[in-house]
Amino acid sequence: MEQLLLQPIAKVDGEINLPGSKSLSNRALLLAALAQGTTTLTNLLDSDDIRHMLNALKKLGVNYQLSKDKKQCVVEGLGRAFNTAESGLLELFLGNAGTAMRPLCAALCLGQGEYILTGEARMFERPIGSLVDALQQAGAQVTYLENENYPPLKIKGTGLKGGKIKIDGSVSSQFLTAFLMAAPMAMEDTEIEIVGELVSKPYIKITLQIMHDFGIDVDNHNFERFIIKGKQTYSAPGHYLVEGDASSASYFLAAGAIAGGCIKVTGIGKKSVQGDIQFADALEAMGAKIEWGDDYIKASKGELKAIDMDMNHIPDAAMTIAVAALFATGTTKIRNVYNWRVKETDRLYAMATELRKVGATVVEGHDFIEVTAPEKLIHAEIDTYDDHRMAMCFSLVALGNTQVTINDPKCTSKTFPDYFEKLASVSC
């Protein structure tokens, strides 16, 4: 196993141009493929999850030209649903990319063809039952190949009817995102009713915005009910700029708050569509100095104190708060993050385990975590659980006058392949 030993970082200072958002990149690629016309995507994220989507689209008959640096992609839209009936059974390997598995599962039900959706072992532990149930309500033919409610899946594309659909919103917002993006191409109008509390609402806002950018508007009734007209076609916007990844910004902003100097991240700002920019508000509540621009956020050092906050709206960036808590006085309480348990790994268990290794006192609950900083951080080998965010979060331990060893550092390739080089570039 590869390891990366990070030496203590005394101070951070400088500017980071963020890679494109994973959530936006894969949504934009799929809608560009289904749209009428050609879309040029710029600032596309170059990472494993995006590669899995691109590979799948190629197999599905979508033509695109990817630039040498893989950050620009010209997609020739089909102007219709996928139709691979003449190709026989197609197997699509999607790694551990939830942002590819869930939306493709819904989109493939719209057209003609037979598909197997598969991936890495962890993907088979990530639930998809709520989405499949909703698709079956709309007439889709989706079956489980191994365990009920989990991939791998077999899909027989026969079109989606639409109609009145109930979908569980309490586990992952990606189920609703997937259904929303497919619904305009259903045969009839669709009315979606959310059952339970809808988690990660900001990610649904991203979905509604990008659908709008591709010419489709959704009638949103307070995130409890959504009405979508059927028999529509997405329209290529011509050019689509992918915002910087707000979740990826969190590590650098936290570093600025802990050991600035001043860190400026560009590619996101107060006009961003991503909910994870609210991470900066949480940092500010802890005592960091934050400055907002239209397309940048700056963070500088402050005396950090613990916070007690419901972070259901920023689940990915909330992980960074858990590590920032190592530098705060008092006990930080992060609440309402059950969906950490169904991400790339069980993040509540993983976070609690690794925080204890560096000396923190941790309480792990069903849907919350409490973190109290030690008097002194200790050098530990951090297991990353094949989870990109674990590796990036725990790099911040090096800001505490201690070495930290990151196991399997290349797992950051899921969203941020050159993360450690970028961190080194602002380390003094």
Swiss-Prot record:
MF-aspect GO terms: 3-phosphoshikimate 1-carboxyvinyltransferase activity
Highest taxon of source: Bacteria
One Pfam family here: EPSP_synthase
EC number: 2.5.1.19
Subcellular compartments: Cytoplasm
Keyword Acetylation assigned: no
Keywords: Amino-acid biosynthesis, Aromatic amino acid biosynthesis, Cytoplasm, Transferase
Binding of 3-phosphoshikimate, residues: 22-23, 27, 172-174, 200, 316, 339, 343
Cross-referenced NCBIfam families: aroA
Protein name per Swiss-Prot or TrEMBL: 3-phosphoshikimate 1-carboxyvinyltransferase
Gene name in the database record: aroA
